[in-house]
Curated annotation (Swiss-Prot):
Site (Interaction with tRNA): H125, Q337
Localization per record: Cytoplasm
Origin: domain of life: Bacteria
Name assigned to this protein: tRNA-specific 2-thiouridylase MnmA
Known function: Catalyzes the 2-thiolation of uridine at the wobble position (U34) of tRNA, leading to the formation of s(2)U34.
GO molecular function: ATP binding; tRNA binding; tRNA-uridine 2-sulfurtransferase activity
Main location: cytoplasm
InterPro entries: MnmA-like, MnmA-like_C, MnmA-like_central, MnmA-like_central_sf, Rossmann-like_a/b/a_fold
Region described as Interaction with tRNA: 146-148, 303-304
Active-site feature positions: C100 (nucleophile), C196 (cysteine persulfide intermediate)
Annotated S-S bridges: C100-C196
EC number: 2.8.1.13
Gene Ontology cellular-component annotations: cytoplasm
Amino acid sequence: MNKTVVVAMSGGVDSSVVAYLLKTTTPYKVIGLFMKNWEEEDSDGLCSTAKDYEDVERVAGQLDIPYYTVSFAKEYRERVFSRFLREYSKGYTPNPDVLCNREIKFDLLQRKVRELGGDFLATGHYCRLSSAAEGRHLLRGLDPQKDQSYFLCGTRRESLDNVLFPLGGMTKTKVRAIAEQARLATAQKRDSTGICFIGKRPFKSFLEKFVPNVEGDIVDYDSQKVVGRHEGAHYYTIGQRRGLDLGGSEKPCYVVGKDMEKNIVYIVRGEDHPLLYQTELTAKELNWFVSPESITRCSAKVRYRSEDEECEILHSDEDSEVRVRFSSPVKAITPGQTIAFYDGEKCLGGGVIEVSMTPH
């Protein structure tokens, strides 16, 4: 009997092409599954999932596959969104997409796959998995502009055992071409960007609904003079340049640190200012796809779009954290962000960055 693959369909072109490829090129029975993680709609309907679900219906109809919907709104709020708010209120810059992958897409969704009798879960992530003969390892996607292994570095290894990433070896251009050729209803749909529960709204206007504004000083760290005011230190992240609204300087201003107790945002002038660069950090909440003891040197990404940085991993007596020492200074290392570790194409694992918020 042919095995069953459940496709996580978002209503976008990527997951639509995944369903199409599995339906037309494999013997699997294909089922579509739409996951709803957010209930609230703002007055403009910017966070509405209705249009996405309609697109899933249209593509499933084109492919003649059954489809279902599941709501994890309650669990998402508890496991992802509540933590997002807690971390931001403390001054950290969390990555909810990494947490969503670990807690929702590759945990709760996996349980739903089993309920539907599925043998595999397929998603539209631009990642690859090594063959079973080599052991199950997460690899970068072939298209460096779309590689999403960074967002899966916190996902438990066992959660990937039955996962398929059909797009991992393709470029986005190729995926679009397949959608056009197949005349899929989502072929022309634009990619979604940003944090899913914020939608197209300005980040600040969304966050202030949940974390109260508290005005404070913006201080030039070098002169220790007050140069401006802010509405909440939690709105600012290390390395940020936009939104400071500070004039009177030939050099651009960058956020270099925060004092959450005193509600102060510190800035420096010039992108080459030494306080913007650090050579070490601590990584906590670690997740490994390989034995961590075997890792001494590797490369790391300290944010999604950053370049790989060569580094040394210094293990401690605490299994829950490691010290990371970079070969060269790295700009704007941000507490709360995700760090992903690599050995060439292989993702070794990841963790959460812990560094001082105050300049030093």
